Every structure is written in C-alpha cells, then in structure tokens.
C-alpha cells in the first residue's frame, strides 16, 4: 500500500515538473501591442516629458502613489514598457521599484533600478481626492477603448479617475 502511494506521489511530481518545464518554454504572446511609432503614444510620451516638473511637485506631495512607465529590455531582447513605484526622484534620475518582471525575461531580474529622467515614458500620481494626474499613455488607451465601445466596468471606473 505504501509503495503504491509513494509511486503515485513520485509520478505526480514528475508530471507537474514536466508541465512546468513545458509551460516555461512556450513563447509569450505579444507584450507590446502598441507600435513603437504610434503617433498618439509618441505624443503622450512627449507630454509626459514636457510635464516632468509637475510630476516632481506631485511626487513631493504624494510619494507613495507616484509611478513611472519605463522601457525595459528583457533578457530575450524584447522591449517591454513597465510600471515602477518611484523610490527616489532627482534632477537627473529616477530610482524605481518594479512590481513585477518583464514577461519575456528569463533568469534573475533586478527589481530596483535607476534610470535617467529622459527615459521616463509616462508618469502618474494619485492625489488625496483619489484622482490621477499624468497617465498620458493610459489616457490614450482609454480613449481608444471608449471609441471602440469597450470602455466598461472596472476600466470605465478607472478612466473616470483621471483629471
């Protein structure tokens, strides 16, 4: 009886390990569905850069709710746009703590990183009244969802928080 149970546990463990390995080998789906030369997103990124002084002021008041979007190249060479919590903001750099890791990344990933301010693609700060400032690329996404008639539910609630 014991040998049967032990055999089932061993076979189950081997099967789970094999399934996990197979899943890790599957190529991830498209991680950047927005083209690099998308004019609306380029304008949003430009606006974010032009308004960094506003972000500095907001960060001073709301450091716990300040985020930035940055381009990160994964170990596979894929460019992914990632959101990070701002840990430190100076006149020349931003230090961020990423909440996750790039989808296409393999191996260790340093979640605390420093970037030049010019690398910031977007910024966002939640104010004390629950409204968001910045978030220019997200606004483009919400506008597109609204135009397509797909801005509903939680996404619509989130979109309503932008000043």
What residue ranges belong to the model's regions?
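Mixed-charge, low-complexity intrinsically disordered regions
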Residues: 2-163
């Amino acid at each position: 009886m014991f040998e049967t149970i032990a055999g089932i546990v061993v076979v189950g463990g081997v099967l789970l390990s094999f399934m996990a390995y197979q899943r890790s080998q599957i190529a991830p789906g498209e991680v950047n569905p927005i083209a690099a030369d998308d004019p609306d997103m380029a304008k949003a990124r430009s606006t974010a850069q032009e308004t960094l002084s506003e972000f500095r002021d907001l960060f001073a008041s709301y450091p716990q709710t300040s985020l930035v979007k940055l381009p990160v190249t994964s170990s596979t060479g894929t460019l992914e746009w990632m959101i990070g919590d701002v840990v430190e903001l100076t006149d020349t750099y931003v230090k961020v703590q990423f909440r996750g890791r790039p989808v296409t990344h393999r191996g260790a990933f340093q979640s605390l990183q420093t970037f030049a301010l010019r690398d910031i693609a977007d910024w966002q700060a939640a104010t004390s009244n629950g409204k968001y400032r910045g978030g220019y690329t997200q606004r483009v996404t919400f506008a597109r969802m609204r135009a397509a008639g797909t801005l509903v539910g939680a996404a619509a609630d989130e979109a309503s928080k932008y000043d």
